[in-house]
């Protein structure tokens, strides 16, 4: 799709109108935060994070690279600049001004690169409301996937095919997994 200057000018005006005070060129420069990631060892993990992406990590079971994380189970360390050596979780607590108008007590992102050499388990992720009430006040787990590489004929499981709660229960209790699970 071709963009023309008129379209770009329109969208620039719209962005500035809606959030201009936070995007103005007159704001003081804020450095880009480069981070040292957190790695996890998982039974389904592999070696691609080291062999194909150049991370210097040991083990043949590296499942996840947490590239942006301020999570209780692992937080990135700032790699350089004014905050070098500081944990992202500490920066979030002590310097909220660096993160714009983000609301909430919990750092809202967990960005991962996953190397799954074996099938992953099917998981059910809560929304924010359920997680706040039942998961010690944490955020829900909304996901977005960007697949860097996969084997031919790979599939993703996204949701299920049950139309009602009763149908879901019936499919689970009777082991009708191939009918229940939605693969793409």
Where on the chain are the PLM-derived regions?
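C-terminal beta-signal and terminal closure region of outer-membrane beta-barrel proteins
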Residues: 4-5
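Transition-metal
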Residues: 24-159, 163
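Residues that form generic nucleotide/phosphate-binding pockets
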Residues: 15, 91, 95, 171, ...
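Conserved, mostly hydrophobic/aromatic
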Residues: 1, 12
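Active-site glycine-rich loop that binds ribose-phosphate moieties when present
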Residues: 164-184
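Catalytic-face loop-and-helix region of soluble metabolic enzyme cores
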Residues: 14-21
């Amino acid at each position: 799709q071709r963009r023309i200057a008129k379209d770009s000018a329109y969208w620039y005006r719209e962005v500035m109108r809606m959030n201009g005070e936070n995007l103005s060129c007159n704001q003081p420069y804020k450095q880009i935060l480069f981070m040292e990631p957190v790695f996890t060892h998982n039974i389904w993990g592999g070696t691609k994070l080291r062999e194909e992406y150049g991370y210097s990590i040991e083990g043949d079971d590296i499942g996840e690279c947490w590239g942006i994380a301020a999570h209780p189970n692992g937080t990135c360390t700032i790699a350089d600049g004014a905050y070098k050596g500081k944990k992202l979780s500490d920066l979030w607590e002590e310097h909220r001004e660096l993160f714009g108008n983000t609301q909430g007590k919990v750092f809202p992102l967990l960005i991962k690169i996953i190397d799954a050499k074996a099938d992953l388990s099917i998981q059910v992720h809560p929304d924010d409301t359920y997680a706040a009430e039942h998961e010690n006040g944490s955020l829900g787990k909304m996901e977005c996937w960007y697949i860097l590489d996969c084997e031919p004929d790979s599939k993703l499981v996204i949701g299920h095919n049950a139309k009602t709660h009763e149908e879901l229960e019936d499919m689970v209790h009777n082991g009708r997994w191939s009918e229940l699970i939605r693969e793409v």
